[in-house]
């Protein structure tokens, strides 16, 4: 069944006196299926979230290439990908570092009997349920996953290491519910190899995709058959500014008034039919860290 089959967990027990049972871990699986043909088949179908059944470098690199294509400047159909990881923190962060994508997020649930595909499916379902791209996913429950042994639960130190290593930690919360600690992507470094937190939170890329679509939809609705004259850029700029103001009211972006001078719409110097726009987008961040100091008064 491929390398993924090695992740199937087996256990055995016996209630008969004097009889012991031993379960041998699954081995021998190799060569997971290539995801490239499947991704190519759905490239033009339209999607927002793709779940990878395999948590392997080859599969996730193929997914990364696909997401960069459909979300790029030509297709402009923003999408994200997810995978699951029930293994160790070390192997998970190593895998995340190999992917380094702001569009791929991996859910880490150590010690789970669930397969990576099952963890990923549950995680993706929660992502799809949140319609506000800027709202954090902290504490949201992932249904259908097993409750791991307390010896496998991650502590705050491990969770922080996971977050800054490109993994989304899952934990067993009150009422024995599996919850998201904080949703992050595998993006850790820029092309120069320098640590870059710009796209670490999953909400950032989802917000940017949301803003892009909102702006494109407004221009398509207002100017379906527009002439391009000297009067056109100011009208387009006014519409874009209105979109940003409305997004600010929804707390998806902020500081629109302070940044509006950076909103530039101008005709292209080479293509007579093209209008270029520079749209400043100050995304609303999530409240993930609270720091306080207790002063003793006597």
Which residue ranges define each predicted feature?
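Loop-centered beta-sheet repeat module
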Residues: 87-162
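Structured, hydrophobic secondary-structure cores that serve as assembly/anchoring elements
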Residues: 134, 139-152, 158-298
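Polar low-complexity, Ser/Thr/Gly/Ala/Asp/Asn-rich disordered segments used for subunit assembly
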Residues: 1-117, 259-261
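Glycine-centered small-residue hotspots that permit tight backbone geometry or close packing
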Residues: 29, 125, 165-166
């Amino acid at each position: 069944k491929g390398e993924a089959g090695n992740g199937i967990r087996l256990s055995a027990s016996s209630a008969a006196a004097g009889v012991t049972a031993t379960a041998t871990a699954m081995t021998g699986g190799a060569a997971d299926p290539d995801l490239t043909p499947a991704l190519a088949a759905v490239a033009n179908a339209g999607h927002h979230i793709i779940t990878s059944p395999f948590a392997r470098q080859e599969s996730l690199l193929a997914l990364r290439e696909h997401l960069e294509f459909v979300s790029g400047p030509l297709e402009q159909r923003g999408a994200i990908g997810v995978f699951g990881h029930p293994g160790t923190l070390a192997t998970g962060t190593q895998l995340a570092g190999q992917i380094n994508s702001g569009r791929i997020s991996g859910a880490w649930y150590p010690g789970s009997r669930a397969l990576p595909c099952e963890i990923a499916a549950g995680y993706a379902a929660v992502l799809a349920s949140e319609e506000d791209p800027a709202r954090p996913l902290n504490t949201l429950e992932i249904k259908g996953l097993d409750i791991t042994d307390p010896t496998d639960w991650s502590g705050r130190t491990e969770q922080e290491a996971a977050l800054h290593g490109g993994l989304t930690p899952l934990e067993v919360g009150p009422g024995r519910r599996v919850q998201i600690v904080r949703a992050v992507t595998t993006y850790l470094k820029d092309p120069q190899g320098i640590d870059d937190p710009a796209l670490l939170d999953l909400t950032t890329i989802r917000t940017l995709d949301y803003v892009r679509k909102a702006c494109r939809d407004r221009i398509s609705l207002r100017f379906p058959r527009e002439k391009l004259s000297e009067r056109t850029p100011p009208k387009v700029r006014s519409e874009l500014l209105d979109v940003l103001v409305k997004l600010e009211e929804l707390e998806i972006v902020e500081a629109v008034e302070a940044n509006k001078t950076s909103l530039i719409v101008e005709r292209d110097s080479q293509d007579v039919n093209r209008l270029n726009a520079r749209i400043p987008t100050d995304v609303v961040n999530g409240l993930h860290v609270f720091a306080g100091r207790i002063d003793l008064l006597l």
